[in-house]
A protein has these predicted regions:
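Second-shell residues forming the walls of enzyme active-site clefts
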Residues: 1-33, 44-55
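Acidic, His- and aromatic-enriched active-site or binding-groove loops in soluble protein domains
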Residues: 10-24, 185-188, 268-280
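Short acidic, flexible loop segments centered on an aromatic residue
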Residues: 397-414, 420-422
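Short, surface-exposed ligand- or partner-binding patches at beta-edge/loop junctions that are enriched
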Residues: 441-470
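Secreted, periplasmic, or luminal enzymes acting at the cell surface/secretory milieu
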Residues: 34-36, 43-134, 138-147, 151-156, ...
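Conserved acidic residues
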Residues: 15, 116, 204-206, 267
């Protein structure tokens, strides 16, 4: 876990120590209380008179205060968990998080006025992902799958045909929680592919829902992925579908990057994430154009696995040390991240690598124009702020949202620094033809970095550059300023 010292935890603001066990590695232990830093070791210090109970009282007060403000609040009415209003909020959040990675020839949004047959292919179109167990699995009252979401939205406007395409993990169970789904299918890969190609040939649109899932060595706890490629023969299915239908849309359901060797053959690619209860409804809204996509990637999709720091430096999979107390959890692998602070887009910038899709990337169904960038001062002191202003205009034909990103580049530093770092962003909604001013303000914290020798945050006078961008590689405007 993240706690490693009892006294540090006591005197530096930690109120509640979380964790299933004690070290994040073992599958369970009978003496867990003895090993939590804020459990028996804390009690022992108090009993021995080495510390008082002032901090303990503060921690208990903080926890109780939160409980009374939330679960024990008198304003919290019966039935307020998982209400329709919660569903509406969940759907809106899901819609705004969906990322349009690629859209050649404006295949998206789907034109329901002209489409007669829409084919949906892929196990992830029907597989439940939000079934309990923690993290993004959660425990939800319901989950709308992509296929159901599309069928409900399209209704009688077009025929929706489904084919499995591939079989991944037919079991409907995650972390001991059962979905009730039975996805068993005894057909061979060739039989599944043949069916998919047959129904896809004459379709107006083909939507492939693939990616990863929550099973072992996928997007799960404890076990790393075994491959960067999509599993379960998906790459072959996508490649063959692209040969028979020019309007192929791939929706990747995953929590992290995957290899896309077919990227040049597929016109439209959507990053669909794990979107919760309203996943299917949100994806349908974006695919048919009810909502213009406005999500941005929170990490880099590398062009190849060797473009990731740990792999480029030969550190992964590292030294295989079995640190687990229980063999049920398998071997634990220690990897030393010698790329240091140069992770994600910072590594790509440093090594001058071209990613498949960069950090901060995300397309829209409309277009945005970036105007002149202005700054309220050319130099600042450590006690001042500096504000950048830019005009953004929707030059397209539909409403949309753009995420304006502010990166800062430190031109000279006593320690190695990234080429640039994201220090602010703002999302702006614009009607067709509308324009708005977007302002982003930073202070000295945005110019600071951690000095691991002095063991403190420092800010050094010098020259900086503010970069306004639509992604880590889509630079729009720059302006220089100084810290005195």
């Amino acid at each position: 876990g993240g706690t490693h010292d009892t006294k540090q935890a006591i005197f530096n603001g930690l109120d509640l120590e979380f964790g299933s066990w004690t070290n994040g590695l073992s599958a369970g232990t009978k003496n867990a209380y003895d090993n939590y830093y804020l459990a028996y070791p804390y009690l022992k210090l108090i009993k021995e008179g080495r510390i008082g109970i002032k901090e303990l009282d503060e921690k208990v007060s903080n926890i109780l205060r939160l409980i009374f403000r939330t679960s024990m609040s008198t304003l919290k009415t019966f039935g307020s968990l998982g209400s329709p209003e919660h569903g509406q909020v969940g759907r809106k959040i899901a819609e705004e998080g969906i990322v349009l990675l690629q859209n050649k020839n404006n295949v998206l949004p789907i034109n329901l006025d002209k489409a007669e047959k829409i084919v949906v292919i892929g196990e992830n179109a029907i597989k439940m992902m939000t079934v309990g167990g923690g993290s993004s699995s959660l425990k939800a009252k319901y989950e709308i799958t992509p296929l159901v979401g599309l069928e409900k939205r399209i209704g009688l406007q077009a025929e929706v045909v489904y084919a499995r395409g591939y079989v991944g993990e037919p079991i409907g169970e995650y972390n001991g929680v059962k979905t009730g789904q039975n996805l068993n299918d005894d057909r061979t890969e060739d039989e599944l592919l043949a069916e998919a190609l047959t129904v896809a040939k004459d379709a107006d649109y083909v939507i492939f829902f693939g990616g990863l899932n929550k099973n072992e060595h996928q997007d799960c706890e404890d076990r790393d992925r075994k491959q960067f490629d999509l599993p379960y023969n998906q790459n072959k299915v996508i490649t063959e579908l692209a040969k028979v239908n020019k309007n192929l849309i791939v929706v990747n359901i995953s929590g992290n990057a995957v290899d896309m060797p077919w990227v040049n053959d597929v016109p439209a690619i959507v990053q669909g994430w794990y979107l919760g209860s309203e996943a299917g409804s949100a994806l349908a809204s974006v695919l048919v154009g009810d909502v213009s996509p406005s999500g941005k990637l929170p990490f880099t999709f590398p062009a190849k696995l060797e473009h990731v720091g740990a792999h480029a430096l030969g550190e992964y999979p590292g030294n295989k040390e079995d640190l687990a107390h229980s063999k049920n959890w398998g071997d634990t692998i220690n990897t030393t991240y010698h790329e240091d602070i140069f992770v994600g887009y910072r590594w790509a910038d440093k090594e001058k690598l071209t990613p498949l899709f960069p950090f901060g990337h995300g397309l829209s169904y409309t277009k945005f124009a970036y105007g002149k960038l202005s700054v309220d001062k050319r130099s600042m002191t450590v006690d001042e702020t500096i504000t950048f202003t830019i005009c953004i205009k929707n030059t397209g034909t539909c409403e949309g949202q753009e995420v304006v990103q502010l990166y800062i580049s430190d031109k000279k530093s006593s320690l190695p620094r990234p080429v640039k770092e994201l220090k602010g962003f703002k999302k702006v909604r614009l009607a067709p033809g509308e324009e708005k001013e977007v302002t982003l303000t930073i202070d000295k914290e945005a110019l600071s970095f951690f000095d691991d020798v002095r063991h403190e945050w420092v800010v050094e006078p010098g020259d900086f550059e503010a970069i306004i961008a639509a992604s880590a590689t889509d630079i729009k405007k720059k302006v220089k300023f100084a810290l005195k």
